[in-house]
């Protein structure tokens, strides 16, 4: 239940802050005098944008493949951490609505849906009261592990921060 709520919030955040990728200002430029008609000055940026789009798609596919490979390795570790969260005297789990395994599954699902998770989104969820401070720390740790195991994720996060991720 909590995982689906969190994924929905991530999707809304992505839609809300999605940037328009076409360069409308350069498409409306009038050709300068001395320039051939039929060739506009925005041709190079459009070609660069298409190349960037293709590169982003390639990087996303590589990230999905890396995540697909590392998920079976990380899952038993997260399950082990869930078991260690039990209190020794009562034998019950501590009160949390979101555990290690759920964080891994949520971040895995986001990556497979081509959403790039980052620390800023986790911080926004904590500040919005959606997750607790402890859950935020757990999510940051799981995201950090994924970043260490999937070298393409930090590159895509950097492009996202620059507003260049398509």
Swiss-Prot record:
Q: InterPro entries from the entry? A: C_Hendra
Which residues lie within the region annotated Disordered? 17-42
Q: Which GO terms describe its biological process?
A: symbiont-mediated suppression of host innate immune response
Q: Keywords assigned by UniProt?
A: Host-virus interaction, Inhibition of host innate immune response by virus, Interferon antiviral system evasion, Viral immunoevasion
Give the intrachain disulfide bonds. Answer: none
| Other observations noted | The P/V/C gene has two overlapping open reading frames. One encodes the P/V/W proteins and the other the C protein.
Q: What does this protein do?
A: May counteract the cellular interferon antiviral system.
- Name of the protein described by the UniProt record: Protein C
Name its species. Answer: Hendra virus (isolate Horse/Autralia/Hendra/1994)
